[in-house]
Amino acid sequence: MAQDVLTDLNKVRNIGIMAHIDAGKTTTTERILFYTGVNHKIGETHDGASTTDWMEQEKERGITITSAAVTSFWNGNQINIIDTPGHVDFTVEVERSLRVLDGAVAVFDGKEGVEPQSETVWRQADKYEVPRICFVNKMDKLGADFYFTVDTIINRLGAKPLVIQLPIGAENDFVGVVDLLEMRALVWPGDSKGDVTMGAKYEVQEIPADLLEKAQEYRAALVEAAAEASEELMEKYLEGEELTVAELKAGIRKLTIASEIYPVLCGSAFKNRGVQPMLDAVVDFLPSPLDVPPMIGHDPRNEETEMTRKPSTDEPFSALAFKVATHPFFGQLVFIRVYSGQIASGTQVINSTKGKKERIGKLFQMHANKENPVEEALAGHIYAAIGLKDTTTGDTLADITNPIVLESMSFPEPVISVAIEPKTKGDQEKLSTAIQKLSAEDPTFRVNLDEDTGQTIIAGMGELHLDILVDRMRREFRVEANVGKPQVAYRETIRRKVEKHDYTHKKQTGGSGQFAKIQIAIEPFTSEEGVLYEFENKVTGGRVPREYIPSVDQGIQSALTDGVLAGYPVVGIKATLLDGAYHDVDSSEMAFKIAGRMAFKEAARKADPVLLEPLMEVEVRTPEEYMGDVIGDLNSRRGQMQSMEDASGVKVIRSLVPLSGMFGYIGDLRSKTQGRAVYSMQFDSYAEVPKAVSDEIIQKARGE
């Protein structure tokens, strides 16, 4: 049975489940696994027993950190699900899972509507053009309002929702949904307490009389929207003919795959209502690997040559590694999405990103943290592979005789760091193992050595991110270490162009000396793609031999790691090599590298250097009576108010606040609002630090 499904890609769906931190995403995934027969006992996040949350910290904190890939079957279709974390510190996990998905289910909290993190994840899905259906969850919750949530999809996301279900009853009285396609009511009858037993089937009933008019109105809108999918449907619709359910589904599917509309369903995953129709919608409306455009990549031997791979087993093998995880028995597991061709376990492939040959040891289809071994990996599917030594997130694996490099993923720079000091020499060794493994798993986790203090500095996307990384070092790698206070990842840049700056590096110490002379220009530089540095060579007439030019570039880049103001990394620089001179005997790559480094340091001092700090977009939801205190407090943290609006009985305040002002904010907010306000924050951009604050940071960094 499973094998038949695997080869017919029309019946395969690779989907993600994406949402705000508490919209009930993991519970929804759990229910899907239950209904598709994979789990016999249901796991609840709040009991710490859910299948996809399998790391110890996830179970303790009740949040999903790593996206587990799980395979399940529904009515003869195969659904591969990636559960993505909703917490903003784990953006990298969301980014990389969206990159390999074909479609997604966006889960919203029926009371809160679109929350800040739902907005972030939605924008990421837009970036990768992932078609979505929406599931308005928690319809049994006090204050749940389906129609308000649909409005927030329009107003906050600027998206075009297409309602294909209406809720029957709300809060405690929520019993089922109206299926607008078939115009019928689906009701999950409860027991004496109103609870639905796990796996209970729904009953098909007549639409309740009080909802009939509303259902007809929404169905008319649905038919009109579906008719826009093709000229034939439009013609039929305009001539007043009835469109069949199959035609409506085909129209909605076409528009969903084109990301023109987003079908909206509703339910309560926790109360087991609405999950089966949502699975039907995944199959009906989300794309199969065959509906997605062919993958584009380039020839590893020549970046200019564009190549494509269709999702077929007849094409040469190509796959993208989108996640690395450490497994207790197998060591390193690499999750791959196979885009074309097929590969048997034990075969040699090439990591075309790094130009290294790799052997695929064993292949598995994953079930959260249970493995199901398979003999071969086929196009259109997601697998975990063991035995890959040099492959990290974003690398392409390809057929040795016909390699391709697929488009990789871009990850944000970390904004916060802590110093970590191992307690003993033995811990130092364990720490380096831990760092090596964790940075292979997580591209947003960075490590560097502070040369002045000898401390190891680890950097990440937020306090929770670093907490969990440190926690994993202690638990998984048994590292005993002292961890410093979180520090802000400041940056440095320049404001002014320096037209030309000369530097000569000369050293005479008996025998051959060192000589390099260069003239450089530096200027502020910004790029759309987030590139932080650019080097241009304008030397003519061989005044600097070609083999030394990369050394100048390397020297300048080495100077960018510690800026002239306070030793922070330098960004937003364009450097141009204008002229130079060399000596036949005394010039060397080393001499030009030193010249590049020193020339940049001197030029940067003349280029009006400034400090940059990360600004966070902070959103606070507070009852009105505390609004004044909350705003006053944000202002005292150098916050800049962006907007204020009302949402379901609370005030929503949006402000841009420097990260340095946000440490420990949660405690202060709780005490100011008696624990009634909640906030979320995410990185927005880097901005110049005001002079008074900047002077203080520089003095501290220089130890004055």
UniProtKB/Swiss-Prot annotation:
Q: Where in the cell is it found?
A: Cytoplasm
An example of a GO molecular function for this protein is:
GTP binding
Q: What is its main location?
A: cytoplasm
The annotated regions of Basic and acidic residues compositional bias extend over: 298-313
Gene Ontology CC: one annotated term? cytoplasm
Q: What is this protein's function per UniProt?
A: Catalyzes the GTP-dependent ribosomal translocation step during translation elongation. During this step, the ribosome changes from the pre-translocational (PRE) to the post-translocational (POST) state as the newly formed A-site-bound peptidyl-tRNA and P-site-bound deacylated tRNA move to the P and E sites, respectively. Catalyzes the coordinated movement of the two tRNA molecules, the mRNA and conformational changes in the ribosome.
The record's annotation in InterPro entries points to: EFG_II, EFG_III, EFG_III/V, EFG_IV, EFG_V, EFG_V-like, EFTu-like_2, G_TR_CS
- What keywords does the record list, in alphabetical order? Cytoplasm, Elongation factor, GTP-binding, Nucleotide-binding, Protein biosynthesis
| Superkingdom classification of source | Bacteria
What protein does this entry describe? Elongation factor G
Q: Where does GTP bind?
A: 19-26, 83-87, 137-140
NCBIfam families the record matches: EF-G, PRK12740.1-5, small_GTP
Biological process terms in GO annotation:
ribosome disassembly
